[in-house]
């Protein structure tokens, strides 16, 4: 009986977390998406963070969020071991923000 209750609780948690992500994907609150992208990145859920950040990089262009969004997008692909895409985004970061906060790190990861 305890196993059944435990399994039901786990399924509820799993389904609610999937619903939360889909809700965030459809949201037009870009600051909320940004906070969730960082949350997923910090939790090493790089696929989810990359999906959100890919949209946000374009939307945030020219804003205070743009620089970190682009860097986190590159790191998200790196975390997924998609080194070619990560390298392209690190290079984009470096050329867009040559004096940015993450320039040295990006430069070191361009040719991974």
PLM-predicted stretches and their roles:
Residues 15-17:
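C-terminal motif of bacterial Sec signal peptides marking the signal peptidase cleavage site
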């Amino acid at each position: 009986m305890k196993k059944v209750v435990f399994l039901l609780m786990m399924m509820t948690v799993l389904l609610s977390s999937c619903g939360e992500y889909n809700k965030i994907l459809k949201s037009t609150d870009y600051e909320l998406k940004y906070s969730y992208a960082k949350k997923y990145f910090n939790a090493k859920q790089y696929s989810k963070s990359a999906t959100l950040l890919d949209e946000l990089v374009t939307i945030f262009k020219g804003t205070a969020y743009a620089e970190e969004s682009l860097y986190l997008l590159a790191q998200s692909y790196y975390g997924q071991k998609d080194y070619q895409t990560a390298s392209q985004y690190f290079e984009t970061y470096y050329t867009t923000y040559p004096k940015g906060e993450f320039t040295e790190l990006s430069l070191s990861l361009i040719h991974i």
